[in-house]
Amino acid sequence: MDYTQEQERQAQFLADNGVDLIIGSYPHVVEPVKWITAENGDRTLVYYSLGNFQSIQNTVENMLGGQANVTISKEEDGTHISDYSLDFVVTHYEQRESSEYYDIVTTYPLADYTSDLAARHGMSVSGNEEFNLASLQGLSSQILSKCDLDESKEQDASKDELTDESTDESTDGEN
């Protein structure tokens, strides 16, 4: 689930023209979340693709979707992204015995999805052995390993460390 050079080129164009946040969706699969730098040094947060929020496609990759969580803060020095994350969702569909169609279609947070639900999923019932909870969790881990999700927390931590150090130094100077 990697973004293409064309997606990267378009994201860079938008960043260079002042866009702060890009949320993509087309390729039906979740792609990495990255920070990119504009020509002027500003940074843009890019969710290359959130995939499908709901779908009855027939691959594991198409059943896993993403949910962007972004906090935008307005302060005296301007507006900025103060927090962001990526949560995963699973499209679940199944068929009642009395129906010839998939008539139960819903979306679950991956964190709440169970092996029992996966066993009842239309893909599992139709014989797709690749569809199971472990494959969904593995795919989400693979995607997360390519994301820049810890960067804002690392920046916040380094700010805290600087604050703590400067506080310690000023306290030492006062004694």
State what each model feature region is:
Residues Q5-G66:
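Conserved beta-sheet core of the metallophosphoesterase superfamily
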Residues M1-D2:
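Short acidic, glycine-rich surface-loop motifs adjacent to enzyme active sites
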Residues V60-N175:
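A short C-terminal boundary segment appended to hydrolase-like catalytic domains
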